[in-house]
Regions:
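Periplasmic/cell-envelope proteins involved in peptidoglycan metabolism and beta-lactam response
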Residues: 1-181, 190, 199, 272-280
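Beta-lactam-recognizing serine transpeptidase/beta-lactamase-like catalytic domain environment
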Residues: 61, 159-203, 209-291
Length: 291
């Protein structure tokens, strides 16, 4: 009887382990099945890292930006729009990892946990469509405004979370990839979205943080008069201003973006106070975009 009891216990343990494994697999399949389906090893779904068939990517006005058919990535008919939306949409070779083609590849594949990438009638699905919040027209205007300069233009609606425009330069036409893109220094960093993956000195926009800290920590700020001679010396370093403002109040210093006023205020406030307000306003934290 003891032998039978031990055998039963072992069988129960094996059965319970098997059941737990089945439950774990089913849960993993429903959660990660889409990611499994679009792995490069699934040659009938992907081709050179890109989806063989994918749904359409459109802008906020339903203008077509991209789709895939027979393993070939298709784009908007307008070359300027193709260049302006390249880093948001993605490139034909999948080198731009922050584009919608990569970020939403599971949705674009049309994967369904029940039928996979095949319809109930046995035919291959063409993928699911997604609509982005960007405007292709605004993006085109932003790229023209950059006028070939390296940088980025982003427009973000803080009330709704919508990204209306995210343009990065340098860029290229995904339907006419330059033959010297790998050797020409003009295309250095072209696969990076400068709005997301590059770092820049904040410049005058940081004066808003300095102003907020000064307003709350310097009681006589409104009655003070600063003097701008076009430059000032801070810790042995010369800080220059674009203009010679002369005697100037804090309010006018903010309106005129006077470097002398805000350099002196930053020194007076000190490192700890400036860091505190920078943290409170989110300058030292990451944030995520989904649009």
């Amino acid at each position: 009887m003891k032998t039978t009891g031990w055998r039963s216990l072992i069988l129960y343990i094996i059965g319970a382990g098997f059941l737990v494994g089945i439950i774990f697999f089913i849960c993993s399949y429903f959660i990660q099945g889409g990611s499994w389906a679009i792995r490069p090893s699934n040659a009938h779904i992907t081709n050179n890292g890109q989806l063989t068939y994918s749904g359409e990517i459109t802008d906020r006005d339903s203008n077509l930006l991209s789709y895939s058919k027979d393993g070939v990535q298709q784009y908007n008919d307008n070359a300027l729009i193709r260049k302006a939306t390249l880093h948001v949409v993605g490139d034909p070779n999948g080198y731009i990892s922050t584009g919608a083609q990569y970020a939403f590849r599971t949705q674009l594949s049309g994967f369904n946990p029940i039928t996979g990438v095949v319809s109930p009638f046995g035919s291959s699905v063409t993928g699911s469509n997604i609509k982005l919040t960007i405007s292709s027209d605004v993006s085109a205007a932003a790229l023209q405004a950059l006028n070939g300069k390296k940088g980025a233009v982003a427009v973000y609606n803080y009330k709704t979370g919508e990204v209306l425009c995210m343009v990065s330069s340098p860029t290229f036409d995904p339907l006419n990839i330059p033959s010297d893109i790998e050797t020409n220094s003009a295309y250095e960093g072209v696969y990076l979205n400068n709005a997301l993956s590059s770092t820049y000195t904040p410049g005058s926009i940081f004066k808003v943080i300095t102003a907020a800290a000064a307003i709350e920590n310097i009681p006589d700020l409104d009655s003070r008069t600063f003097h701008c001679s076009g430059s000032t010396i801070i810790n042995g370093e010369k800080i220059t201003c674009d203009s010679v403002h002369g005697d100037i109040s804090f309010q006018n210093g903010l309106a005129q973006s006077c470097n002398v006023v805000f350099a002196e205020l930053a020194v007076e406030l000190g490192k700890d106070t400036m860091t505190k307000y920078a943290d409170q306003l989110g300058c030292n934290t990451n944030f995520y975009l989904d649009g």
